[in-house]
Amino acid sequence: MFPMSSTSRSSAANNRKDPPRKKNKETPSPVTREPTSIDSLPNDLLLNCFARVSRMYYPALSRVSKRFRSIVTSPEIYNTRSLLNRTEKCLYLCLRFPFDNNTHWFTLYQNPNRTVSDKVFLQIPSPQYPLTLSSNLVAVGSNIYRIGGTVGDDSCPLGFDREPSSKVSILDCRSHTWRDGPRMRLNRRSSTTSVVDGKIYVTGGTEDTDNPSHWIEVFDPKTQSWGTVTNPHIVKVWEEVCYRRAVKSIGHDGKLYLSGDKYVVYDPDEGKWNSVEEHWLIGYAIGSSNCVVDNILFYWDQGVFKWYDSKVSSWKQLKGLEGLPDDFSQREYCKLVDLGGKMAVLWDKWEYSGVCMIFCAEISLEKRDGDEIWGKVEWFDTVLEVGASCSLKSADALSASV
């Protein structure tokens, strides 16, 4: 082979084609997506989301838009809460003011404008019924029942010339609307009312001339009907007509406890009355602020919380409770309410400015060592301010499941 000349080498180099270069792939520019607004979600998805949120936030949600308000006030949301097992105990307060023919109703809600406990009582619609004095309030499920009392001339709010009533009014705590319920067989005022296994037992508050076989009536919310229970005859019959019997009741452990001239207990399963041997034990709770939480009876008296240990038939002091105000033990009275495994405590305090401050504490309960219960103060704060003429002592506090 002959050697290639420099000129030929140069020509060959110039004629040689470079290998094709790989083209760089263009990097796609990032796609900017608009954030999804919760308001753009369909109603059924919003309802499912809101049903999982505590009912205490519903007033704040209802202020966002008319659409949100429509969802959180719909019957469907409470049906969904029940299916999702998201029902909760909500606290209600009924206040009465001197020389005022109206009752004032409040429920505890979350307040986004507060920075401590973020909870406050908000007023809800009151019934458009004539004022009923000496009535009883009791809650079953999502309803609050106002039973009996006196009706008459509204210009005489102290109760003169007023007649006892068999009327029953029902507050639906899901919609905050009132309706009439089935009337009792007898007119009553200043009776005592307790709940046992979902049924309402109304005792006393009748005239001596009334049928004694109807002295105790029992209402079944499922069948919306009234029945009677055998009269245990625990009060003396006086010659004069007397409405205000010294009869008190407590529903506990599936039984109805009554105190009158003696202490008795009624077992609905057996359908009979028995004497209470340790009557003074139950008497402590009946005469004081009390409530039942997870089938355990609690009461408060003279600054001390106690619970009833049914295993040893003895009252024991509730331990812990650090965080309550220093002067709490000096309160004359307070209200105890079941909050579904926890306990709400309400008390009031008068200020020199002429204002009555209503406080609330939420206490979680824990069993320790088998025979002790400890309470932990989750929070406490002022939840309502009213005029000094109002007193929590004459108020009613209770909870409903919604």
From Swiss-Prot:
Keywords from the UniProt entry: Kelch repeat, Repeat
Sequence ranges of Polar residues compositional bias: 27-37
Domain F-box: 35-81
SMART domains, sorted: FBOX, Kelch
Matching InterPro entries: F-box-like_dom_sf, F-box/kelch-repeat_ARATH, F-box_dom, Kelch-typ_b-propeller, Kelch_1
Domain of life: Eukaryota
Biased composition (Low complexity): 1-14
Name of the protein this chain belongs to: F-box/kelch-repeat protein At4g39590
